Amino acid sequence: MFAKAFRVKSNTAIKGSDRRKLRADVTTAFPTLGTDQVSELVPGKEELNIVKLYAHKGDAVTVYVSGGNPILFELEKNLYPTVYTLWSYPDLLPTFTTWPLVLEKLVGGADLMLPGLVMPPAGLPQVQKGDLCAISLVGNRAPVAIGVAAMSTAEMLTSGLKGRGFSVLHTYQDHLWRSGNKSSPPSIAPLALDSADLSEEKGSVQMDSTLQGDMRHMTLEGEEENGEVHQAREDKSLSEAPEDTSTRGLNQDSTDSKTLQEQMDELLQQCFLHALKCRVKKADLPLLTSTFLGSHMFSCCPEGRQLDIKKSSYKKLSKFLQQMQQEQIIQVKELSKGVESIVAVDWKHPRITSFVIPEPSPTSQTIQEGSREQPYHPPDIKPLYCVPASMTLLFQESGHKKGSFLEGSEVRTIVINYAKKNDLVDADNKNLVRLDPILCDCILEKNEQHTVMKLPWDSLLTRCLEKLQPAYQVTLPGQEPIVKKGRICPIDITLAQRASNKKVTVVRNLEAYGLDPYSVAAILQQRCQASTTVNPAPGAKDSLQVQIQGNQVHHLGWLLLEEYQLPRKHIQGLEKALKPGKKK
């Protein structure tokens, strides 16, 4: 379901009543969880968000996010745990085991075929058709996928372990997993006999090189089953088989690498130094600490990683900046009550001068179907002029008719050629043009018809352009040009009051510039650390607006001007940004 990128509709903090309902739903859906475990999974006071999204096939899914990780998702009123949750509660669902080579196929969207199952010494778990199950890999009990059983255990055995076993909904490494902290499965020892007993166990499980080759051809449902998995029949046991590289790869991060907190501390330091060295200038000071985080540090986060201060040892931005101030890299002051700003930076500090800027990579700005996301490039916007009926006589000699679209330079050339061809240039003063009946009808007002006989070149051209209808052409990268009458509407940024006197930022007309409102909302939600929603724009057909909690005009302006490189003339409302020292 999440093999391809999804589209976020909204991301909001959960209400108290919804939190209580979610707890009740979790208790009903997963009766094996105790009261303490339910409270741990759905905390009472910690931040919990509801993300509504559309999967790539159009399914409406509700995802519950806690601590930056998706913990549960709801589809057609059924509640499912994510792999992040299953790693904390590995026995929550009946678990079936498969080979590490199969994982790549599952991540790509394949269902799990029964030949891919590994038969444990104790036999397969007992399930009925439609039961929710977990899927783990040989050597590690941490689930890497969840799916719905396509048949009961008895039917699986009767079929000789052939056919489709599980409809896979979610996997480790899919796009739902990527929306979290992207941690690897923990190493959880299998509930099995020790290696000595396994070697004596009749029918012990193993996989030879031929079988590994077959597994690489495992197919989707409906295709020929080239990748059937059988238990090997040689004398060697699993304990004697060489360690599978796929299994090693899955567990290596959690055992050998640094802890997630240490990794986040390093990422925080990297983004901090990168922002000071490349983005912040002396003229930007004093700089709100919230702006420094949202507009500068987040922009320096490497592609594929997510900066989350709550997962660092500092927990809060203010605590981290205090540490940087103690190291005399920056100076932070409270210029107004409750609002801190960076007022000074020591750009000669050894940590800044010695910092090596990471290899730049284009920031993925659009969320598209498929695993490859494309960077945003601003469109080429060109003003045009449309020939109205009243100007047809002037332009028909050059082959143009009513409704023709022309550039300003083309209009100039046509008017000059018309004047020269009809010998209208004044003989005594080359800067003047005599007006013939066609020019009089096209560019003069009625009260000027008998009084104005000549016009300077610049006045003639200006009047001509004013009489033409405005139009424009938008060319998005890789697409055919789009030509429309009228003037292109600017991206409109406004502030509005909502319930409880809360202020929100609303932005409209993003689509005209090739921007996906859902993508922009997702980026702003991360940058501003505020809830965002996408709704139909009032009074505009087939147009959406993005709403962000609080005054986020500064963050929005930085995104549009600095990162998307859109011209300022196409954006209105930037003056509504918070001034340094003012409260939100």
Swiss-Prot record:
One of its GO terms (molecular function) is translation initiation factor activity. It is found in: Cytoplasm. The modification Phosphoserine is found at residues 237, 254, 361. Residues 247-257 have a biased composition (Polar residues). One of its GO terms (biological process) is formation of translation preinitiation complex. SUPFAM superfamilies: eIF1-like, PUA domain-like, SWIB/MDM2 domain. It comes from the Eukaryota. Gene3D superfamilies: 3.10.400.20, SUI1-like domain. The modification N-acetylmethionine is found at residue 1. Translation initiation factor that is able to deliver tRNA to the P-site of the eukaryotic ribosome in a GTP-independent manner. The binding of Met-tRNA(I) occurs after the AUG codon finds its position in the P-site of 40S ribosomes, the situation that takes place during initiation complex formation on some specific RNAs. Its activity in tRNA binding with 40S subunits does not require the presence of the aminoacyl moiety. Possesses the unique ability to deliver non-Met (elongator) tRNAs into the P-site of the 40S subunit. PANTHER family: EUKARYOTIC TRANSLATION INITIATION FACTOR 2D. Belongs to the eIF2D family. This is Eukaryotic translation initiation factor 2D. It comes from Homo sapiens (Human). The lineage of its organism: Eukaryota, Metazoa, Chordata, Craniata, Vertebrata. The gene is EIF2D.
